[in-house]
C-alpha cells in the first residue's frame, strides 16, 4: 500500500532508496566521495593507455602507464579509506537512523491509510445524501 502517493506528502518517501535502481545509489555515493570515481577513471585511463602502448610496441610508455595504474589504484584506495573515515558514522548510529526512517515511513503509511478511510466515509455519506435526494425527488 505504501506504493501509492499520499495527498499530503510531497513524494519524498524514505523507502525510495530501497526501491530505486542501483545507479541512483551509485550517484549518491559518488556525491559523498567524489575522489573515488575520479581515481577509478584515472586507473581505467592508465590501463587503456598502457594497452595502447603495448599494441604500438612502445614498452617504455607501457611500463610508465602500468606504474601510473598502480599509483592511481593506491590513491583510489586511500581516497576510499579517507572518505570512509571522514564521512563514516558509527554503525550503531546508522542502524538507529534506519530505524527512525522506518518508523517515519510506518507513521506516514498509517496517516495515509487514515486519510483514505476518511475519504471513503465522505464518499459513502455523499452517496447516501444523493440517494436520499433522489428518493425525495421521486416522491414529489
Curated annotation (Swiss-Prot):
Cytochrome c oxidase subunit which plays a role in assembly of respiratory supercomplexes. The keyword Transmembrane helix applies. It comes from Yarrowia lipolytica (strain CLIB 122 / E 150) (Yeast). Pfam families: HIG_1_N. Gene3D superfamilies: 6.10.140.1320. Its main location: mitochondrion. GO terms for cellular component: mitochondrial inner membrane; mitochondrion; respiratory chain complex. Associates with the respiratory chain complex III/complex IV supercomplex. GO terms for biological process: mitochondrial cytochrome c oxidase assembly; mitochondrial respirasome assembly; regulation of proton transport. Residues 7-98 form the HIG1 domain. It is a multi-pass membrane protein. It is found in: Mitochondrion membrane. Belongs to the RCF1 family. The keyword 4Fe-4S does not apply. Keywords: Membrane, Mitochondrion, Transmembrane, Transmembrane helix. This is Respiratory supercomplex factor 1, mitochondrial. The chain crosses the membrane at residues 35-54, 66-88.
